Regions:
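N-terminal basic/disordered segments at the start of proteins
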Residues: 1-38
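Short, glycine-/small-residue-rich phosphate/pyrophosphate-handling segment
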Residues: 110-124
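Short Gly/Thr/Asp-enriched flexible loops that form oxyanion-binding sites at enzyme active sites
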Residues: 86-99
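Active-site and donor-binding regions of nucleotide-sugar-utilizing enzymes
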Residues: 85-86, 114
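Short gly/pro/ser/thr-enriched loop/turn and capping motifs at secondary-structure boundaries
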Residues: 12-13, 39-41, 108-113
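Short His-Asn-centered micro-motif
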Residues: 78-82
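Short coil/turn connectors at secondary-structure junctions
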Residues: 1-2, 28, 71-75, 97-101, ...
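N-terminal beta-loop-helix "entrance" segment that forms/cooperates
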Residues: 30-68
Length: 124
């Protein structure tokens, strides 16, 4: 399964990298992105593993970015507020049997909420 992790703060980005490393150990293909304007592409490049493909700063609108990933059938992990994820996926939700799995994790990594394609898509 191909997974995209997106964060919105530096702390969220650090958690994204930790999660990505663990998922890569389980043979998942993981991409790490952030919308945190305090992190430059150079900082992101230096702090991530070489195996994280297509990682970097998201300059486009988060809804457009999310729609593109969902059209590629990639699972999404949002690190941050559930409301951000819900708004980002809203225009791309079509069919519970075909939608990409989407989960939200708080910045501390304590709570995980599957918000789309839980049973069928594998988010649970």
């Amino acid at each position: 399964m191909k997974i995209c992790i997106v964060s919105f703060t530096k702390k969220g980005y650090e958690l994204s990298c930790d999660i990505a490393y663990k998922l890569e150990q389980s043979a998942y293909e993981v991409e790490v992105f952030t919308k945190c304007s305090r992190l430059s592409d150079e900082n992101i490049k230096n702090s991530t593993d070489e195996n994280f493909r297509n990682s970097g700063y998201i300059s486009q609108n988060i809804s457009d970015w999310t729609a593109a990933r969902m059209s590629e059938k990639k699972a999404l992990i949002f690190i941050g507020a559930c409301g951000i994820a819900v708004r980002a996926i809203a225009s791309s939700v079509n069919n519970k049997l075909k939608d990409s799995p989407v989960i939200v994790i708080d910045e501390l990594g304590k709570f995980v909420i599957p918000i789309l394609s839980g049973h069928v898509g594998g988010a649970n």
